[in-house]
Amino acid sequence: MASGGKKSLAQSIFQVGGNGGNALGPILAALVVQPFGQRSIGWFSIVAVIAILTMLHIGSWYKRRLLNATLHKKATPQPFIHLSRRRVHWVLAILVVLIFSKYFYLSCMTSYFTFFLIDKFHISVQASQFCLFAFLGASAIGTLGGGLLGDRFGRKYVIWASILGAAPFALMLPFASFGWTIALAVVVGLVISSAFSSIVVYATDLMPDKIGMISGVFFGLMFGLGGVGSAFFGWLADRTSVEYIFLVSSFSPLLGIVAGLLPNTQKKAVSQQ
């Protein structure tokens, strides 16, 4: 509704708020929670209340828009490309694999990067939180950049370059020195985080009459696979080591190669017009 035709950009702007909040978490933990204790977490409830009030206002606005749209209901939107039902399901399965490869790796980074740095380089907890902020901040920037590039160059290519392109940097990270580890983490965050908005918009282009369902499924997979990945790597770390789980997780972006099997929706859409 609010994208103005730039769907990937609109989706990335929506996501960058959440990613930006995640990035600020380690900084606030280092500057507020660590020196003042766990009770200081309650101070952040003020921000949550402001967010709730803002969402109530937006919800009222959206309700009016829905009522207006119902009165002026248009024909059911048609897919940008015409694929058989079986092919659509196959493409959606590929997108699920890509979501898995991305968020399985990110779950390891977001949950255990600080422990990895403390264990391998013996830095302080506070310093490790600043390093995690660098990774998450780069992820927020990458999310926004991915939306811009997806609208300009095509979502398939952004998805492909984002996940598979992060693989060499992820594979080098467990073996790097401290300085290079942080630099590689920033590059991985920038690159791998640029894919999700393009994945969601790509999926909704396949089934434009089920935007709510498709968005819900992929956002659910994002959180669900992240949680499963975090639990899995925690279990594996207890039986091996933190350094070992980073070695294992570094191979997951290689699954990005399956993005080459995706049809180029934007190119076909233009040829059909």
Report the location of each language-model feature:
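Helix-to-loop junctions at the C-terminal end of transmembrane segments
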Residues: 143-154, 237-238
